[in-house]
């Protein structure tokens, strides 16, 4: 029987040199290990990432309290449970914590245990994790959102918006789409170098040059697509996809530059302009009418529900509008958004909610209500590639896991190559079909 007989956590370092939690789960015949990511721009409604707060050790970012919670309370409570009973394990974790935001034991403690149990269960069952979670119908490789230009909280530059991404949609296989992304990444690097701009990279592996404006950033990406020999799509207002090979996705992370007192969006890093919610929605409408944009994540601030409604009414029929800080992988927040008719997609970050079961329920709720799901990394990552497995397990169709540099990002892309190889002829790359706009 695959009975849990030991759970052990340790403090390791993530891709930014900050502590995070890694968990090992042992049964008599299987083993699972998982490392927990962390974010730079975090939503106020996210589950609590428990940090030690001792400024003299890792600047207060240690996670030894969370580690201790795993090695004592959680280890004792879960010993003897069947590692294959994922829902029961996750329910027990939630019961042990007993708070709505995981603030007692820490979402970082709970998630590490939840994911490691799933991996141990998969090993016991003799299955890949994606097959163990998703069953026989798990066969869809995700279209990647590749973060090639960084700004906002992810980079020390003059760009307000956090991520400018490319999405290779006009391909029949994941491996061809990945090659396209890599070639555009290198074309962009050469383009920046030719203009005397920095090719240093941000937290997620994208370039972080100092540019004159936010518009210059997206125009550089469009130019790089062409330089690499690929065809960008038309603006959303002009038919959008057509024979496009590549489209652009944005994550402005608008909560980061929303002034809650002024109720204005303040472009703090560039021209200092201040926009109302209606003006911000119109700003994005203008961009959608000008550039080949297929997706905008967090185009409005996390609690600006009225602004989100305006944006959805303006461009929600032709642009994927992804809620990250808005929904925080939380089924209750997503249900509220569905009821209010805001957005049409949810970003899925496992550490925003804290357990695998809750993550899968959020994805299911989205699917049942016609919302797409984008499986996502965090800016503070590790070599753990679980999200690649989850993307295929759920047939989500889209993944957001950084640029074509930094091993913490490439580990996910490379894991998807292995999954594609394992699936063989069963592998599906959805391309344009990943979108419902």
From Swiss-Prot:
Binding site for Mg(2+): 251, 297, 324
SUPFAM superfamilies: Enolase C-terminal domain-like, Enolase N-terminal domain-like
Catalysed reaction, written as an equation: (2R)-2-phosphoglycerate = phosphoenolpyruvate + H2O
GO function terms (MF aspect): magnesium ion binding; phosphopyruvate hydratase activity
GO biological process, any: glycolytic process
Active site: 204, 349
Pathway in which the depicted protein is active: Carbohydrate degradation; glycolysis; pyruvate from D-glyceraldehyde 3-phosphate: step 4/5
Cofactor: Mg(2+)
Record EC number: 4.2.1.11
Keyword Lyase: yes
Keyword Zinc-finger included in the entry's annotation: no
Classification via Gene3D superfamilies: Enolase-like C-terminal domain, Enolase-like, N-terminal domain
GO cellular component: cell surface; extracellular region; phosphopyruvate hydratase complex
Compartment list: Cytoplasm; Secreted; Cell surface
Source taxon at top rank: Bacteria
SMART domains for the chain: Enolase_C, Enolase_N
Binding site residues for (2R)-2-phosphoglycerate: 162, 349, 378-379, 400
Role, per record: Catalyzes the reversible conversion of 2-phosphoglycerate (2-PG) into phosphoenolpyruvate (PEP). It is essential for the degradation of carbohydrates via glycolysis.
PANTHER family: ENOLASE (PTHR11902:SF1)
HAMAP family assigned: Enolase
Family: Belongs to the enolase family.
Designated name of the protein: Enolase
Organism for this UniProt entry: Chlorobium luteolum (strain DSM 273 / BCRC 81028 / 2530)
